[in-house]
Amino acid sequence: MKVLWVALVVALLAGCQADMEGELGSEEPLPPEQPRGQDSQPWEQVLGRLWDYLRWVQTLSDQVQEELLNTQVIQELTVLMEETMKEVKAYREELEGQLAPMAQETQARVSKELQAAQARLGSDMEDLRNRLAQYRSEVQAMLGQSTEELRARMASHLRKLRKRLLRDADDLKKRLAVYQAGASEGAERSVSAIRERLRPLVEQSQSRAATLSTQVGQPLLDRAEAWRQKLHGRLEEVGVRAQDRLDKMRQQLEEVRSKVEEQGSQIRLQAEAFQARLRSWFEPLVEDMQRQWAGLVEKVQLALHLSPTSPPSENH
């Protein structure tokens, strides 16, 4: 009985994996098996033979369900989700700190949009975890239901969730680019505005210096020239300081963008490793089930020669 449940769970997971691999563009083939049909996969052969025998099965052991359908998958997904949201929150706080010199209105808008993007990403990841938990519950109660319908529905949910997660990541990258451009443009406008405000003062000081030179003489002219040069130097100092701050802000934004891309790469690598771990869990079960199934077929065939009652024939 345990072998039959193992076969059923493996068949469902293999089917969902096949649909997801088709969406992600994976080209890794499943292990070879003697075909039941010309184009059928090994899990399809196992599932087809298994349904003939499951018509005789009326009850299942609760202990078998607890052993096979544990919460390890959902727990690992929860840890990955919490780590991801922690990194997103740290990135948002760092970016808000860098945008502190900007106008209050701009800073509030950026903070609000980043919080919304973080909330969407968290909602999508929570939805993914809930879908897997729902799928686990449906597998526990799936005896007598349509496996193909359950597998297709789960694969469709995962494809939609993957598209939503990718869309959120693209939206976050686009917003980063917009914020970087806006910060650069705002800093340049600030420098230009400071120069425009100080230009009349410089011109006025030059005019006064010329007037004083004609009225008072060379000493006052020298003093006015020194004042003009001091004011000009301060203006240049303000411009250089603003430019340095702009360059520093650009560098920090670039570091943040690199950090986000690195985190995205780590998430993808963890997802691939998680998928490989799932495959390594269930492939030995499939092989063991196939060996036990062969022995079961021999026993059934032997029983057919000894008993007038025979099981239903295969219609695949």
UniProtKB/Swiss-Prot annotation:
Residues 1-18 form the signal peptide. The modification Phosphoserine is found at residue 146. It comes from the Eukaryota. Residues 79-254 are annotated as: 8 X 22 AA approximate tandem repeats. Its main location: secreted. Residues 265-316 are annotated as: Homooligomerization. APOE exists as multiple glycosylated and sialylated glycoforms within cells and in plasma. The extent of glycosylation and sialylation are tissue and context specific. Glycated in plasma VLDL. One of its GO terms (molecular function) is phosphatidylcholine-sterol O-acyltransferase activator activity. It is found in: Secreted; Secreted, Extracellular space; Secreted, Extracellular space, Extracellular matrix; Extracellular vesicle. GO terms for cellular component: chylomicron; extracellular exosome; extracellular matrix; extracellular space; high-density lipoprotein particle; intermediate-density lipoprotein particle; low-density lipoprotein particle; multivesicular body, internal vesicle. GO terms for biological process: acylglycerol homeostasis; cholesterol efflux; cholesterol metabolic process; chylomicron remnant clearance; high-density lipoprotein particle assembly; intermediate-density lipoprotein particle clearance; lipoprotein biosynthetic process; melanosome organization. Residues 209-289 are annotated as: Lipid-binding and lipoprotein association. Transmembrane segments: none annotated. Residues 157-167 are annotated as: LDL and other lipoprotein receptors binding. Keywords: Chylomicron, Endosome, Extracellular matrix, Glycoprotein, HDL, Heparin-binding, Lipid transport, Lipid-binding, Oxidation, Phosphoprotein, Repeat, Secreted, Signal, Transport, VLDL. The modification Methionine sulfoxide is found at residue 142. InterPro entries: ApoA_E, Apolipoprotein_A1/A4/E. Heparin binds at residues 161-164, 228-235. APOE is an apolipoprotein, a protein associating with lipid particles, that mainly functions in lipoprotein-mediated lipid transport between organs via the plasma and interstitial fluids. APOE is a core component of plasma lipoproteins and is involved in their production, conversion and clearance. Apolipoproteins are amphipathic molecules that interact both with lipids of the lipoprotein particle core and the aqueous environment of the plasma. Homotetramer. May interact with ABCA1; functionally associated with ABCA1 in the biogenesis of HDLs. May interact with APP/A4 amyloid-beta peptide; the interaction is extremely stable in vitro but its physiological significance is unclear. May interact with MAPT. May interact with MAP2. In the cerebrospinal fluid, interacts with secreted SORL1. Interacts with PMEL; this allows the loading of PMEL luminal fragment on ILVs to induce fibril nucleation. This is Apolipoprotein E.
